[in-house]
């Protein structure tokens, strides 16, 4: 307990000291790892499942109130983009606090290798490419026609982002209220920054209709860099609707869903403007479940790009596949994602048997 108090005290001491000696910037970036990284099922539904009550590791990143019951599965997802230059990892599981309470945990990683640093590498010699002639473009600090970079002065560096998200929810006046605490460690070359943020979500199911609400970065999420600079991300509001249709004769479920987001600074070129100044975005998803074993999914992001996926479920093993072709959410190329969820009890049994074999 004393150690925990010391950590909290030091964290807030850094914040207070930094405010006195650094710049504070309100930015629209810094927490994208919690938006881009998820599991295959969530991304196949275009991240529109804010009001869809499913036991899925990535759902709590959309709405912490969807930590509805303890899920005895651990979910793993790997994604590689841009010919292996960018890689991301996703791990999600639930951890009991006591016999009747639990925390849903997600661990994230995203790394980009081999980023070129061209500072100081420009041969700023103008249009003719010859030093000292003082022709057009020479010495202006910009890469102009006829100029080039000195390859020997270009070096490569890496960027790494580690994220940790914990969600817990409780029933309050027929609504399930959830709190999501997120922590981030961001390194760029030799620089690093740490930050924390809070999301608050709500969910209610009424006659097979799910309603979800979440405020992200409340009151704001902060990232403190080693240099002392502080980057603050303002809050945004997201809401979702889901409707369940059951056809018991065919053992079939149909689940359409919708998401709307009212943004602040984190808008994109595809955002719609309400009243000419309020950026909003929409996405939609659809999932069909046959005999609770076979899943078919399709989703549409704000920019109109389609996502699709399938899934197979057994008692203690789930596999999901998703195909994405969305430059805004997941890079500039087509992406294939594969997620695997395995029962923790099955893993314990497997490793116990291996240990016994070694003995």
Predicted regions and their residues:
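Low-complexity, intrinsically disordered short segments enriched for Gly/Pro and polybasic residues
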Residues: 1-2, 123
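Hydrophobic h-region of N-terminal signal peptides that target proteins for export
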Residues: 12-22
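Sec-dependent signal peptide recognition
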Residues: 4-14
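A general structural signal for short secondary-structure junctions and capping/turn motifs
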Residues: 3-4, 35
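Subset of outer-membrane beta-barrel
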Residues: 23-359
């Amino acid at each position: 307990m004393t150690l925990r108090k010391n950590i909290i005290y030091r964290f807030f001491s850094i914040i207070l000291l930094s405010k006195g000696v650094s710049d504070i910037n309100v930015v629209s970036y810094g927490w994208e790892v919690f938006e881009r990284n998820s599991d295959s099922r969530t991304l196949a539904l275009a991240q529109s499942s804010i009001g869809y009550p499913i036991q899925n590791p990535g759902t709590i990143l959309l709405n912490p109130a969807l930590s509805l019951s303890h899920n005895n599965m651990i979910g793993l997802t790997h994604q590689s983009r841009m010919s292996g230059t960018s890689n991301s990892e996703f791990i999600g599981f639930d951890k009991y606090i006591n016999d009747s309470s639990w925390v849903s945990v997600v661990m994230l990683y995203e790394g980009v290798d081999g980023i070129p640093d061209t500072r100081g590498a420009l041969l700023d010699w103008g249009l003719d490419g010859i030093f000292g002639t003082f022709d057009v473009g020479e010495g202006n600090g910009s890469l102009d026609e006829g100029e080039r970079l000195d390859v020997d002065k270009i070096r490569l560096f890496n960027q790494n982002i580690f994220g940790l998200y914990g969600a817990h929810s409780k029933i309050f006046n027929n609504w399930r209220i959830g709190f999501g605490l997120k922590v981030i460690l961001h390194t760029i070359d030799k620089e690093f920054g740490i930050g924390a943020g809070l999301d608050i979500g709500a969910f209610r199911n009424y006659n097979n209709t799910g309603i979800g609400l979440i405020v992200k970065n409340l009151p704001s999420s902060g990232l403190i860099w080693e240099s002392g600079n502080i980057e603050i991300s303002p809050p945004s509001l997201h809401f979702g609707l889901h409707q369940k249709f059951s056809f018991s004769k065919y053992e079939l479920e149909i689940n359409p869903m919708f998401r709307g987001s009212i943004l602040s600074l984190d808008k994109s070129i595809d955002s719609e403007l309400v009243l000419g100044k309020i950026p909003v975005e929409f996405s939609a998803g659809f999932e069909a479940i046959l005999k609770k074993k076979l899943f078919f999914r399709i989703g549409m992001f704000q920019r109109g790009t389609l996502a699709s996926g399938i899934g197979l479920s057994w008692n203690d093993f789930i596999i999901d596949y998703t195909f994405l072709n969305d430059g805004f959410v997941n890079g500039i190329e087509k992406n294939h994602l594969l997620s695997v969820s395995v029962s923790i009890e099955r893993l314990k049994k497997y490793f116990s048997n291996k240990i016994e074999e070694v003995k």
